[in-house]
Amino acid sequence: MSKEVLEKELFEMLDEDVRELLSLIHEIKIDRITGNMDKQKLGKAYFQVQKIEAELYQLIKVS
């Protein structure tokens, strides 16, 4: 797989994962306001952060 293709795929994955994280953060914020904190959503958000970190690390290695 070429460097350009790998970078493109990594950017697409990052875009998708960042959007998912933003959605989760929005949901968590609403849950907090309504008093319905959901620890599962916090766990999912934390997992998304770890995925994003790994993808950024891969991007550094490829660049």
From Swiss-Prot:
Subunit structure: Homodimer.
Pfam families linked to this entry: SSV1_D-63
Superkingdom assignment: Viruses
Function: This protein may be involved in virus assembly.
Cross-referenced InterPro entries: D-63_sf, Helix_hairpin_bin_sf, SSV1_D-63
Protein name (database record): Protein D-63
Alphabetized SUPFAM superfamilies for the sequence: Hypothetical protein D-63 (SSF109801)
